[in-house]
Structure formats: structure tokens, C-alpha cells
């Protein structure tokens, strides 16, 4: 009787270990999918402008550029948009090209174009650009190289951020 019980107990422990391993693997997967900044494949990302014309992202990134992925249903994104607009209106911000990308419908994107005056482009799904969490922003130098990327809100008026931009401009 005790032999049967110990085999059953060992089997339960094995199943428990497998479940823990599965949970750990799922956690690692979720972390890397949703909490890390994906690489920006500028030549493979095709966006749509307000006229319905398709563009490769690499065609839109001239000079120093900020590429910003957002959505209208994202609270942190909506909180950040006025801060970006304020930064864009500074002398430093006027020297940077901004590209906003969303998966919102065209009518929703138009509301934000009109409200903020942003260059907003659309993707059918942000996951087509390997973006699974938003907001996510990329700062590109004049050679189209990503020099800064972050998931979440940026502090657009932070001195360190402004110094980083000034370094790129010089």
C-alpha cells in the first residue's frame, strides 16, 4: 500500500514540477513579448497616411526622428500626447521629425491629427511591427539608427532627454 502511495505522490510531484516549469516559461515569454522594446525594422514596417498611401517607415525617418507608437484606448498614451505636443513646440522640438503610428481607425486618427497637429500614420495591427505594448518610442539619429528606445512614457521635458537631443543635433 505504501509503495502505491509513494508512486502516486511522486507522479503528483512530477506534474507539479511540470506546471511550475510551464508557468516560468510563460512568464519569461510574456516578459519579453510585452515588457521589452522590440527592434525597429524600418524597411519592413509599412504604414498608411491620411490619404491612404502606403509608405515604408524608412521613407519617413529623415534627420533626427522620434517614432512613437500609441493608441487612443491607451491611458498612458493619451496622457503623453499633450506633453509631446508641448515639446514639439519648443525650439529643440522643432528640429526633430516626429512620426506617430497607431492602429486606430482612420476617423479616430483624424481626431488626433486635428487636435495635436501630428503626422499620424496607421498600421492595421501594431503587432505587424512587433509592437505588443504601448506607448513605445524610438529616437533615431540622422543615419536612421536607434539611439534611444523605451517602453512606456518618456519625460519629454527632462533635462537629460533634452541634452541627448542636443548632442544629436550638434
Task: Locate the predicted segments by residue.
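N-terminal targeting signals for export/organelle localization
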Residues: 1-48, 170
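A short beta-strand-turn-helix
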Residues: 44-65
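Short pre-active-site segment immediately N-terminal to redox-active cysteine/selenocysteine motifs
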Residues: 63-65, 69-73, 133
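Conserved redox-active cysteine motifs that mediate thiol-disulfide chemistry
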Residues: 69-86
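Short helix-capping segments at alpha-helix termini
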Residues: 90-95, 116
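Short, internal strand/loop/helix patches
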Residues: 99, 110-143
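Short, polar loop motifs at secondary-structure junctions
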Residues: 103-107
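Thiol-/selenol-based redox modules, centered on thioredoxin-like
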Residues: 142-170
Amino acid at each position: 500500500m505504501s509503495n502505491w502511495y509513494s508512486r502516486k505522490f511522486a507522479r503528483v510531484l512530477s506534474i507539479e514540477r511540470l506546471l511550475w516549469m510551464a508557468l516560468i516559461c510563460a512568464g519569461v515569454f510574456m516578459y519579453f513579448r510585452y515588457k521589452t522594446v522590440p527592434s525597429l525594422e524600418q524597411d519592413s514596417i509599412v504604414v498608411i497616411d491620411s490619404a491612404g498611401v502606403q509608405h515604408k517607415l524608412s521613407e519617413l525617418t529623415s534627420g533626427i526622428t522620434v517614432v512613437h507608437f500609441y493608441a487612443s484606448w491607451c491611458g498612458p498614451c493619451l496622457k503623453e500626447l499633450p506633453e509631446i505636443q508641448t515639446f514639439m513646440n519648443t525650439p529643440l522640438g522643432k528640429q526633430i521629425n516626429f512620426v506617430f503610428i497607431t492602429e486606430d481607425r482612420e476617423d479616430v486618427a483624424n481626431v488626433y491629427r486635428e487636435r495635436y497637429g501630428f503626422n499620424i500614420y496607421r498600421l492595421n495591427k501594431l503587432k505587424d511591427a512587433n509592437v505588443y505594448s504601448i506607448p513605445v518610442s524610438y529616437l533615431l539619429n540622422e543615419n536612421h539608427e536607434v539611439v534611444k528606445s523605451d517602453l512606456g512614457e518618456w519625460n519629454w521635458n527632462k533635462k537629460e532627454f533634452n541634452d541627448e537631443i542636443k548632442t544629436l543635433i550638434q
